[in-house]
Amino acid sequence: MKKLNMIISLLLTIFFLTSCVPNVDDKTTTEATTTDITEQKIQIDSKKISDNFTWDDYLKYAQSEGAVIVDLENYFNAYFFVIDKFKLKSAESGDFKYDVYENNTAVISEYTGNEKDIVFPDTIDGYPVVGIGKIDFRSRFKSKKITVKTGSNTLFISGSSFDYCYGIKKVVLNEGLTVIFRGAFGFAESLTEINFPSTLEEIGDSAFYDCKKLMTLDLSKTKLRKISAGCFSECADAEKVMLPETVCRIEKEAFFRDKSLADINIPRALTEIDTTALSGTKINVADFKSAGINFGDGMIWMNDKDIALDREEQ
């Protein structure tokens, strides 16, 4: 049984690391170079949360829980919010409540202040602040105009931290930020300005759903390898998207009904776009087809009409 678990863990690791590596024998691939698997493994290992919960430990945990998705978001989520034994205590300092973990880090659990410019600390009572937890901003800042700046040690922003926070106008994200959980800024419909740091590797599903006033989405300096499902859906004012060359997959409804979107680049690594990813935008599908991008079976709906996808047989 122990040997079987090791094999399953290894397979999960390989699946995660190779999920976006293009097949060099596939006729539809672009000129992207294949990703160095060894380098990716080193990058994953460098994000070890704790000696007591390594990436390999997470893979075993994910397998035991029957997890379908294996990624950094779920790794962080398991350690900080699911497995109880790692949290040591809760405390409060100034305008922030926080939780302390066995790896001597802290995660902000609540903001009790009333400032319009909210700056999360780099450290709190000597602990590096590595995450913003599931703070209920919606009940206190639903309409008040605010700006948010993350601390220099922040690695992740939890899901739904700022969702339905209609008043949030500007977000300044730190270099070092690695993951934005699913739904983190959903329905932040006053948000007009946000930067995406070069260290960012994952943005979860629907993280910026219905952020109506974001006009430009500059992801070009990030390390994203996919644009998650619904990530920027209903961003009605978004006119331009700049993707990093590392993106190889754009998932379902990623830019769904971004009705102003007319400009998006095609990364060299991109090989797959879901049929609904660009539905309701002004993007010309022909540009992607000519680059050999796989849209999958069926039709893609754009600008209120169906456009057939003329795919070559593989």
Regions found by a protein language model. Name each.
Residues 78-89, 103-111, 308:
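Generic recognition of long tandem-repeat/solenoid scaffolds
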Residues 49-52, 63-73, 95-97, 101-105, ...:
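Structural signature of tandem-repeat unit edges
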Residues 18-19:
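C-terminal motif of bacterial Sec signal peptides marking the signal peptidase cleavage site
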Residues 25-51, 55, 60-67, 71-72, ...:
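N-terminal, intrinsically disordered, polar/charged segments of Gram-positive cell-envelope systems
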Residues 111, 135-140:
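Acidic, Ser/Thr
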Residues 22:
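Short, conserved catalytic or interaction motifs in soluble domains
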Residues 159-161, 181-184, 204-207, 228-231, ...:
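Consensus positions within tandem repeat domains that build extended binding/scaffold surfaces
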Residues 1-6:
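Positively charged n-region of N-terminal signal peptides that target proteins for export
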